[in-house]
Design a protein with these regions (language model features):
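Juxtamembrane membrane-water interface segments of multi-pass membrane proteins
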Residues: 1-21, 37-54, 69-94, 108-130, ...
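Accessory "access/gating" subregions that flank catalytic or transport cores
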Residues: 7, 24-35
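Hydrophobic alpha-helical membrane-insertion segments
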Residues: 25-29, 94-107
Length: 222
């Protein structure tokens, strides 16, 4: 997480869905990391390790990064996979709905853990009903958000706005190939023009231009 924050430090970033997913992952990881401090403390862990507090903690660490990271990755690579943009409006509604549901679900689990609700039990005391009802509602909200996001994927795949080969103006090699991606990825070896972590030409080019650049770099065959 520190690497991600350090990468953004003094940088310019934009408010599109893939970037919002990065912020969501950072937020969830921060919550998971802070609550993990309590689980590393022996006196506190004696109380927390067998109840819903630790359940909420590892969901923030694993699901909080995996789910929203996957949604951001889909939004980012959707133009490369399909040649079309993911519907930003519908996708964002689904994303933020799932994010809100995630907070409702697992924040209430922290409360249940602080109250002492044990994990891995079928029945529990009535004092935990409110926390569990709130958590259940949050889980349904996550599901609704995922369905909306799935609808954005399906509708965009069918009739979304056509995207260029490199809509993000990225300079990494995965965006230097054509869309749709040809069988061999590159017709010629890609030209590396910059340092390792900002390599590539500014925009993907057609095969003839790439081949011309390659010939200029290594010498045209005689």
């Amino acid at each position: 997480m520190l690497v991600v924050i350090g990468t953004m430090w003094r940088g310019t970033f934009w408010s599109r869905l893939p970037m919002m997913a990065v912020f969501a992952v950072i937020f969830n990881k921060m919550i998971g990391g802070v609550t993990g401090v309590y689980l590393s403390d022996v006196p506190a862990d004696q109380y927390f390790h067998g109840n819903m507090f630790v359940t909420a903690h590892f969901h923030y660490m694993l699901m909080g990064a995996g789910l929203f990271g996957a949604m951001g990755g889909i939004a980012y690579y959707f133009p490369k996979m399909t040649g079309r943009y993911l519907d930003e409006r519908t996708g964002s509604i689904g994303f933020w709905t799932a994010f809100a549901g995630f907070q409702i679900t697992f924040m209430s689990m922290f409360v249940a853990g602080l109250q002492g609700q044990p994990r891995r039990v079928l029945q529990f005391d009535n004092m935990f009903n409110i926390s569990n009802w709130i958590s259940t509602i949050g889980a349904y909200v996550i599901g609704i958000g995922m369905l909306i996001f799935l609808a954005a994927i399906i509708s965009s795949w069918r009739s979304g706005q056509v995207a260029p080969s490199n809509p993000w103006h990225a300079q990494t090699l995965d965006w230097q190939t054509q869309t749709p991606v040809p069988l061999d990825n590159f017709p010629v070896l890609p030209v590396v023009t910059k340092l390792p972590y900002d390599y590539g030409v500014p925009d993907p080019l057609d095969p003839k231009t790439l081949e011309k650049q390659y010939d200029e770099k290594v010498g045209a065959p005689s």
